[in-house]
Amino acid sequence: MVEKTGAEYEIFAIRYAWRDARRSDHFIGGDPHEGPMPMDYFTWVIRGSGSEGGRTIVVDTGFTAEVSARRGRTHLRCPIETMSELGIDPDSVDDVVLTHLHYDHVGNFHKFAHARFHLQTREMGFVTGPYMRYPKFGHSFEVEDVVGMVKLNFKGRVEQHNGTFELAPNITLHHVGGHTPGLQIVRVMTRRGWVVLASDAAHYYEHLQKNRFFVQAFNLGDMVDGYRTCERLAASPDHIIPGHDPLVMKLYPAVSPELDGMIVRLDVPPKKAD
């Protein structure tokens, strides 16, 4: 267990969409136990407490209803509008972390009129470089999202990082790559210790626990090294939050009974899986 020191934060996961899928959709090489394996889509909110009270950082911004319909996803709610349930006004958010620029992590960015967007330099280079001519890589990006980031960069609102960056006291960004060249994860100190928002460094708990590879990958070596980085940075395996696993909504408590299935808290210990 890593010793707790300094600023602590609350963390919330907002479930905004889902899709029906099979196990073979999520593991390279298929799966001998083929069966249903739905995928949830999340954005995350980090909110300061104590000395960092009032500070809000958003991690990823989801996708729009229009993109959802075109890609065959079930859109439940706008994740940015849902933040009002936490008392968050997007216009008051100063910092948005984009773990990478896939369509389900960067859509709705335009709803943050004043924020700075934090991503890895390698991710910006990837989406504006030669690999986008290949459908295997390019299909997970929305061109208008990429163009939007380029325009914001010209306006001085994109902060590009090379590796580890301290965004705030006890909040750090860490480059891992793998899924995309510029994928980054977020390490946050909470009341229960260091929590790692793994995003797509680990789509499901099973990827991490069994060293399985997700089907969409740029570099498999970096992907499995990313699992080890998540483990090294988190206080325990229970402190790692995968990016798309429906188990997250079952393991962590809802903010309120009315928000069950919509928003859960990640800064408290999880329930034990059945």
Q: Each PLM stretch: what is its role?
A:
Residues 11, 46, 60, 93, ...:
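Divalent metal-coordination and catalytic microenvironments
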Residues 2-4, 77-88, 92, 122-175, ...:
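Metallo-beta-lactamase
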Residues 73, 77-81, 185, 189-274:
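Cap/insert and terminal regions of metallo-dependent hydrolase folds
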Residues 28-32, 71-73, 133-136, 211-217:
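Short glycine-enriched, charge-decorated loop/helix-capping segments at active-site entrances
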Residues 73-119:
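Active-site metal-binding motif and surrounding structural segment of the metallo-beta-lactamase
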Residues 16-17, 61-64, 101, 122-123, ...:
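Active-site metal-binding loops of divalent metal-dependent hydrolases
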Residues 55, 114-115, 236-238:
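A short helix->loop->beta-strand "cap" motif at the edges of active sites that frequently abuts
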